[in-house]
């Protein structure tokens, strides 16, 4: 199925969700558009939401959904965190060792793959470093683009199931127009057999997203834009009761998720 996604030029949306409104909103969107999706939690949200409790709502809604919904742990920083994620319903993980030197990244991902594949859990890795600086120009100064020939070696040696690439994308809000290196996406796609993942996609323009998918991106992570949609709804409904505000947030998240599903060409794919 991974090969079909690569060859068919669409991308599966990955939505970070850390509260009921976001979770329900993206599942509403997936159901309405008959779209397979990935829903995801990560360490950055544990200060807001108890993962060990919220995971059961994620799992319950994923199981009830009439479209495929994968439960993913985003940017796993260490072994303990990933094991906890898998002990609490997650059926897909990302081990982000991209800040480590190359050989250490290889060794760490191989270790994860060897362990998690025994439980039938796919492992996403990152090669190159996207970083987390708030100013785009500063982020690029510290940036490590993915090296296509290294990517080939990396995927072959680790056995990772998908690969997050660094191609001019950064996390959070872009302070300047992002410059996506489509040439790198194409070269990496030629060199490796696994789906490629684009992180930090919220601020990237629609045309660039479509082009990235044509070049080989098969999974796209969205978080900031869901938050922006939620905030707009909160501002519009701020004089209403909290119950009404919550419903407005769920609807706004749904609408933004539907927009992304259509943009990525993922609508209707659940029924193929």
Regions found by a protein language model. Give the residues of each.
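Short, small-residue-biased leader/transition segments that mark boundaries at the very start
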Residues: 3-5
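Terminal accessory/targeting
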Residues: 9-14, 272
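Short catalytic-loop micro-motif centered on adjacent basic/acidic residues
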Residues: 12-16, 71-72, 94-95, 196-199, ...
């Amino acid at each position: 199925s991974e090969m079909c996604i690569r060859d068919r030029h669409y991308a599966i949306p990955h939505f970070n969700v850390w509260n009921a409104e976001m979770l329900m909103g993206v599942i509403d969107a997936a159901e309405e558009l008959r779209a397979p999706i990935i829903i995801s939690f990560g360490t950055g949200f544990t200060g807001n939401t108890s993962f060990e409790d919220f995971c059961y709502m994620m799992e319950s809604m994923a199981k009830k959904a009439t479209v495929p919904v994968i439960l993913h742990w985003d940017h796993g920083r260490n072994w303990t965190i990933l094991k906890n994620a898998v002990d609490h319903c997650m059926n897909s993980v990302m081990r982000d060792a991209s800040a480590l030197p190359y050989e250490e990244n290889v060794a760490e991902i191989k270790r994860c793959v060897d362990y998690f594949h025994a439980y039938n859990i796919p492992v996403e890795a990152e090669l190159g470093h996207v970083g987390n600086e708030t100013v785009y120009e500063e982020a690029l100064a510290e940036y490590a683009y993915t090296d296509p020939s290294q990517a080939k070696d990396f995927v072959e040696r680790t056995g990772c199931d998908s690969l997050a690439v660094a191609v001019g994308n950064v996390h959070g809000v872009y302070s300047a127009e992002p410059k996506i290196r489509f040439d790198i996406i194409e070269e990496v796609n030629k060199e490796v057999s696994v789906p490629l993942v684009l992180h930090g996609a919220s601020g990237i323009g629609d045309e660039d997203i479509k082009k990235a998918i044509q070049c080989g991106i098969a999974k796209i992570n969205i978080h900031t834009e869901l938050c922006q949609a939620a905030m707009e709804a909160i501002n519009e409904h701020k004089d209403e009761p909290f119950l009404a505000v919550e419903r407005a947030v769920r609807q706004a998240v749904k609408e933004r998720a539907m927009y992304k599903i259509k943009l990525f060409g993922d609508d209707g794919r659940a029924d193929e």
